[in-house]
UniProtKB/Swiss-Prot annotation:
It comes from Nostoc sp. (strain PCC 7120 / SAG 25.82 / UTEX 2576). Pfam families: DUF5357 (PF17310). The lineage of its organism: Bacteria, Bacillati, Cyanobacteriota, Cyanophyceae, Nostocales. This is Uncharacterized protein alr2393. InterPro entries: Uncharacterised_alr2393.
Amino acid sequence: MNLLFKDLFGIFKIFEDVYERIRKILIPTTAYSWQTFIYLSVFSWIMSYFATGYIRDIIALCGWLFLIAGTAWYTTDDPLRVPGTFMPVGAVITGFLVSVFAFSNQEDVITSRTIVLWPTISALITAIPEFIEGSDTDSKTRIPKPDARQKIIVLVASCMMISCWLQFYFVLDKWLQEYPSLLAENFGRSTFVITREEQQKIPTNGVVILDRLQPLVEEQIAERPWSEVERWLLEANVRVGQLGREVLDNNLAQYEEKVLWRVEPRVVNNKSGYRLDLLSIWTGPTANPRGYFLRKSCQIDPVATTPINTTTNSRIPEEKKAVAEIQCDRLNKLFSGAAPPQQ
């Protein structure tokens, strides 16, 4: 029985210790403490919710300042260092809050600029105490000692380099979003870029251009009189160029690389008719100095058709008319090098 009471008292002692720790964190011993700043920040954000206009912005600004001050105070009381550096973990947390406060917007709280400048701001926050000596009530500026200067320079320079690498990542990510055809390039020999996804064997937008262009060309050629089709082929550069610009405007409007694609035709006369090659030519940056292009070939042949005879007693033989028949390849082919010259 005594053992049972001891166990119960032990459990109550654990809850009492937890309660005391929570009470110590939540209830400040003096009004001038980091808890006061945190409570002021929460109060400011609650009040800003009910305010409007510039008053709400001013109250929210005060809330951010109170939060940054309270966090910095709490994390520097007994600082935990980042391994291998003299940077306190509190400076990293405070730097993140400052970066979010300075570079966030209404649409996105965390932006690319927030992430990029976070390490540099944290390093500057770490370096600030080295330029101040004295207590909170009696302090003055000073020049850091030579050994402290060296540590500050190394820390700030290292964090700036990290910021540069983060910015490099966001720049590449933006390029790949605006120029997705770059994903078809081979980055195997690159020192900086590592692709996690499987490399595209053929540029997607180049395929989209030819696949959208094919039905437009077929509509203007299929079952048209052969003489009219031959005139169309003589003007193929103008006709296909107009259709190509229409395809680019309708399907690649959201990409910056739209201006780097060029659509051209190549007409080849063969024994049975004509071969129309539709080319989507990439003029943007590529590992191949001569560039590359995609081709979709369409065979155009004349086909004789007999007009429908509306008179039943006519003995005059009907003249057969030739119309165009067009058949295009199902797949697009990728070719390295410059596009073939026009004939």
